[in-house]
From Swiss-Prot:
Assigned protein family: Belongs to the DNA gyrase inhibitor YacG family.
Cofactor remark: Binds 1 zinc ion.
Region annotation (Disordered) ranges: 43-65
InterPro entries reported in the protein's UniProt record: DNA_gyrase_inhibitor_YacG (IPR005584), Znf_NHR/GATA (IPR013088)
Descriptive protein name: DNA gyrase inhibitor YacG
Cofactor(s) the record lists: Zn(2+)
UniProt GO molecular function: DNA topoisomerase type II (double strand cut, ATP-hydrolyzing) inhibitor activity; zinc ion binding
Function per UniProt: Inhibits all the catalytic activities of DNA gyrase by preventing its interaction with DNA. Acts by binding directly to the C-terminal domain of GyrB, which probably disrupts DNA binding by the gyrase.
Assembly and binders: Interacts with GyrB.
């Protein structure tokens, strides 16, 4: 059976997706820590649709209906 291969999300290097790589989907601990650091410094963000903030602005109590 052929081992699945993916690209490291940080550097793009080809990586085997199996138990022999403890850092998957990353190629190394270095790439894994770089990615973690980018989340910690808020370089990555999940887009806000603005729907929740609109509800809070319209309802001063902040409670949901």
């Amino acid at each position: 059976m052929k081992r699945p291969v993916v690209n490291c999300p940080q550097c793009g290097k080809s990586v085997a997706w199996d138990n022999s790589n403890p850092f998957r989907p990353f190629c190394s601990e270095r790439c894994k820590l770089i990615d973690l650091g980018q989340w910690a410094t808020e370089s990555y963000r999940i887009p806000d649709t603005g729907k929740d903030s609109e509800k809070q602005e319209n309802d001063p109590s902040g409670s949901e209906k």
